[in-house]
A protein has these predicted regions:
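RNA-binding accessory domains that recognize and position tRNA/RNA substrates
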Residues: 1-186
Length: 186
């Protein structure tokens, strides 16, 4: 199924729908990591954003839940050049496609993610829409994109319950307003 990434400056990228088949408006950001896509997906700092991965092949080692930075993914959307549909890793428990669907996260594959990253680097972060609606009307969408605000992202990622981790050495308190699990573990 075709998908479209529409940016607030009117730029449109056409690709293939991945994950959930729903429309989202979000702030579009990029990540240049060559590995660690699951860590990116489960990093609370990406809440309220759609993440563009610049590395050209994503998903080749699958989903290994042990590597997650939190219990769930946080981005509103996911943007990749090529999505591996058959991961090869003895630790793999799932595919990114299934992971995105499970958490109702839409995405787009098959676009020039490096061109998108260059555009964002030159013009600054922009809002964008991921949609499968081929009958979109730019004149209606662009004002919505320009008016979009990510909202209260910190409230979404803030820990609501106290957690105690046993360790050696001095006692440390961590106020969790979106901390990755590995911060608490270290």
């Amino acid at each position: 199924m075709k998908a479209f990434l529409i940016l607030e400056d009117g730029t449109v990228f056409t690709g293939t729908s991945i994950g959930s088949k729903k429309e989202i408006i979000s702030e579009i950001v990029f990540n240049t990591s060559m590995t660690g896509y699951l860590e990116v997906l489960t990093d609370p700092s990406y809440a309220g954003q759609a993440v563009c991965m610049t590395y050209p092949l994503i998903g080749n080692y699958g989903i290994c839940h042990e590597d997650q930075e939190s219990l769930r993914p946080w981005p509103d959307g996911y943007i990749v050049r090529e999505l591996s549909r058959m991961p090869s890793n003895f630790r793999s428990e799932d595919t990114i496609q299934n992971f995105l669907k499970q958490y109702d996260i839409p995405g787009i594959a098959g676009i020039d993610t490096r061109a998108l990253t260059k555009l964002l680097r030159e013009k600054g972060t922009m809002n964008g829409m991921i949609t499968t609606d081929a009958a979109y009307k730019l004149e209606e969408i662009i004002p919505r994109l320009k008016a979009y605000n990510t909202g209260k992202v910190v409230e979404r990622v803030t820990c609501e319950e106290k957690t105690v981790l046993k360790g050696e050495g001095p006692k440390v308190a961590l106020m969790d307003f979106g901390a990755k699990d590995n911060i608490a573990k270290s």
